[in-house]
Every structure is written in C-alpha cells, then in structure tokens.
Amino acid sequence: MSTTLWSCNDTPDYNDAYDNTTATTAVAQKLVAGTGLIGHMIDDRTWTVTDGVEATEIAYVSYEGYTTKMFVVEVDLSNPAISIAASLPDNGTTFKMQSMTRQALAADAAGNKVWAGFNADFFNMTTGVPRGPVHRNGVMLKNTFDSGERSVFYITRDKKAAVAHRDDYPAVNASGVIQEAVGGGVMLMTEGELVTQEEEGLEPRTAVGVSEDGKTVWFLVVDGRNWSYSNGMRYQELGLCFQSIGAHDAINLDGGGSTTFLVRTTPEFTDDRFKVCNWPCDNGGQERAVGDGLLIISNQ
C-alpha cells in the first residue's frame, strides 16, 4: 500500500484572495488610491440625485477586516439652481426635535424643492437645542457654542461654502456674510491638511467638507454599530477620505444614532417622496429625531 502525502502551499496567496481594490466609480477610485483603507471592494455605484448633485454608495472591507458602508454626496454650488440650507423642525425658528424626513417634508415646496438631507449639529436630547450656531435665511437664530471642540459650517450670501473653528466664528458672524449655518464638532481638515484629534473609535458618522473655492461641498455618511453590515469610521479616516476626494477643509457633524442621509426619489410631491439611504443604528433602521439639519435644495 502506498501513501500519498499532501501539504499546504509554501506561499499561500492570502493577500491575493483578500485584496480587491477595483472600484468602478471615480469617487471610490480616489478613496482607494488616497486613503489606504479599502482592502476588499464589495460594491460601489454613483447616481445623479438631480443636476448638480451626485451620490456615491460604497461598501467595502477595510484592511483591518471591518465591513463599512459609506455614502459620498457631492454638491456643485456653481449650479445656479442648487443651494444648501439649514433646516429646523417644521421649517420654523423654534428649537425642538424632529426626524430629517419630517424636516424635509416641511421645507419642501415648489421653487424650493428638497433633493437630499442630512442631520447636522449635536444637540440637547431633552430640549432639541443645537450645541452650536444656527443661521437660516440670513437670520441668526443662535450664535453660541456649548463647551468642547466645536466648529461651524456655513454658506455665505454669495453662495460659497466654508467651515470655521469656534474661535473664528465671532469674526465671521460679525462680517455679516452668513446666509445659512449649523454647528459641528471637531475639525477634520484645515487648509488642505489633516487635523489630529483624540480618537473615539469606530462610530457612525456624518461629516461635511468644502473645496478651497467654496463651490463644491461633500457630505460623508458612514453607517456603524452593525458588525456584519458596517462598523463606522474614526476621525482620522474621515479626514483621509475628505483629503482624497479633494476637500480643503472639513468638520465632523453629529453621528451615532443621529446619522441620517435621505434623498428624493421622485420629482412629484407624493407622501413617500423621501427615502432614507443609510441605516440609523439606534432604532433598527428608523430615524432619530434631531435638532437641526442640512438640506440640498433646487429652485426649479
């Protein structure tokens, strides 16, 4: 009787089996090339939300082995029909809490058509008062910050986007240039450079970045707290993503169970015209009521 002995390959192709960084969309290709995060691309696709607004959905496994689902929304403010506005519950001026879908429905109207929406600032979960400033339609509703590392995202009266650290906000506010504004958390990028922050681990994230000329805005939404679906992102990783896609400055917004990204699915004014694209983690996929938000609007 003869015996045949088998052994494992001396040079197993573990990396070859794992690595798959082939991306089909321009945004995902930039993230693959610039972040070093993506080990295995599961899927990526880009679609046009409306003229001047492109959304990309990306699913991947990181080199650390974490599944990740993220959305990148690019807004072209040089398009004369497109604008970004701060939102409050019931399209009003009173601070309270309401889901982003309800905020979008309240603001949506002919000539002020909402195409996408995102949660924005951290807020008092009892009163709904945002932690940072709020400006709507050129009117300052709140100009103070709670303690801690805070920032602000704003749109100027000549329709340019910018972000500022809390220390720089008083001068910006005094200049009278702000048309829309919401508060945010830590700075992720400033003047093209990453800002080092004390890490808080992998979490669901909402964040916003702007180009140097203020005419392009990127929203990043990352789901988390669901091991098999998406684990979230760290601050440094968010910054790398913004840097890779071309942002000059970026800030973190409220995340966790507040993280929400919705889009309009039809130009008609049907009751179900808005769809939440991400997976809000605290309520099994159901939206959390939040203090304020940011809406992408067209005047057509």
Residue spans of the language-model regions?
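C-terminal motif of bacterial Sec signal peptides marking the signal peptidase cleavage site
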Residues: 3-7
